Amino acid sequence: MSQVKLKPKKKYGHIDGCVRCGRKRGIVRRYGLHLCRQCFRETARQLGFEKYS
């Protein structure tokens, strides 16, 4: 018999923490970013966000 490889189960819903540093509080989930607010401030320019005021 041939070996059947199972794929890991895909996780749906909220991500546990920031994908960059792992922090659990202050998560920015809008547009699928999943960054904490501190990491968002550090990387916003590279992501294409501009500050107008």
UniProtKB/Swiss-Prot annotation:
Gene: rps14
Cofactor(s) annotated in UniProt: Zn(2+)
Official protein name in the record: Small ribosomal subunit protein uS14
Domain of life: Archaea
Protein family per UniProt: Belongs to the universal ribosomal protein uS14 family. Zinc-binding uS14 subfamily.
Subunit and partners: Part of the 30S ribosomal subunit.
Cofactor mode of binding and number, as noted: Binds 1 zinc ion per subunit.
One annotated GO molecular function: structural constituent of ribosome
Pfam families xrefs: Ribosomal_S14
The keyword Repressor belongs to this UniProt entry's keyword annotation: no
Summary of the function given for this chain in its UniProt record: Binds 16S rRNA, required for the assembly of 30S particles.
One cellular-component annotation, GO: cytosolic small ribosomal subunit
Organism: Thermoplasma acidophilum (strain ATCC 25905 / DSM 1728 / JCM 9062 / NBRC 15155 / AMRC-C165)
